[in-house]
Amino acid sequence: MGGGGYLEDRVIHPTLTLPNPTHSGYFDYDKKSQNPKSPLNPWAFIRVKNEIVTLEESLFSMLPAIQRGVIGFNDCDDGSKEVILEFCKKFPTFIPISYPYEVILKDCPSLWHQLYHYSNYTLSFIPKNEWVIKIDGDHVYDAKKLYESFYIPKSIKEVVMYSRINFVVQDFEVFVCNSGDFGFLDAWGDQWLFYNDCEPFEIWQHNGEVLETWQHNDDIYEILKLKDKHHIKDKELMQWHFPLAKKRRNAIVDNDLIPLKEFKKHHADLIGTRIEESMLDEKRILEMYQKFNLAKG
């Protein structure tokens, strides 16, 4: 499937001129974070569709680590658009980008309705040859750990691959989705910090090649090929993912759930090395969950 994956079909924008950040954060403690070419000052690359339940908590959680970003949104009818516009008004170094086409996952009538073209449209607002981190609206971030991860890459050829755990809360008890290695998705490959000199997103067509980085979204695959890049694992877990909190997913029943205590017992070797124990504190996770906009879920 060709078209939107090529430069001549992309919408190219002039370099965005942003004001200085109006918010403070960990980036204030290192002058190198003021350099727009530094990995300590990446652009947040965010795409949103109906994530009202977790969105506000997610955006504010990453704010002490990230100074600037673009937030693409489409087909929002749950209040997510209004949250984004208000957030960007309050923090003008984040740019709201309304995608003017419906994204259709099956039997798509044109490339403009393709998920990968929506991704390219949003990404095209970020200047080339600067650092980018993918941020998701159903993740909550430990901002200190997130910012510290920006020190990992030592060259523009390195890509940081982030790990995650998918948390589910049922009846005030925390579970982990049994995916990856007994619930631990180790540098899974759909969240990354990278230098923006790569080719645009493409539709995934599996022909036997090994894909460096891929993203799964329901029944459609898209990839961002990071050629000639060296992939580096994150040093420690810096986020919580709540995949079933989304409005369109909250009716999904996941019967393959691991109680948090079992996860901690199974992965005892990771606690204190790849996962700080406080990241798995049930009280902390429940307090976080209760801050979500659950009434609109």
Regions inferred by a protein language model and the residue ranges of each:
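Active-site-proximal specificity loops/subdomain of glycosyltransferases
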Residues: T17-P39, G79-W131
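Active-site beta-to-alpha loop of glycosyltransferases that engages the nucleotide-sugar donor
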Residues: P39-F60, D75
